[in-house]
A protein has these predicted regions:
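Vicinal oxygen chelate
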Residues: 1-37, 47-74, 87-97
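Conserved SAM-binding loop
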Residues: 83-85
Length: 97
């Protein structure tokens, strides 16, 4: 369970029955969850860790505005995952509990 403020996200990975594979490069405009953003405190370390675990990134982390870093990639199942590093003092920061 991922918690941030008053919101939570619970992620499942089914082993049985064996899930059917879907198109791994399906467009993000298709129905269903197509994009998950995770706020991290060290985007460089998470980028390297996830890349080693099989995630394919579209690009290395890039600066957005003056103080935010972001990158997008696809996990081994084709899900689009965004990594976002926002300084704690930024009004956009979400503090996980």
């Amino acid at each position: 369970m991922l918690k941030a403020g008053n919101a939570c996200v619970e992620l499942f990975e089914y082993q049985s029955p064996e899930p059917k594979r879907r198109e791994s490069m399906r467009p993000v405009c298709d129905h269903g969850i197509t994009h998950l953003c995770l706020q991290v405190t060290d985007i460089g370390a998470e980028y390297k860790r996830l890349e080693a675990a099989g995630m394919t990134f579209h690009c290395s982390p890039k600066r957005v505005g003056s103080d935010i870093l972001a990158t997008y990639g696809r996990d081994p199942d084709g899900n689009v995952v965004e990594l976002l590093e926002v300084p704690a003092e930024s009004p956009l920061a979400v503090v996980a509990s």
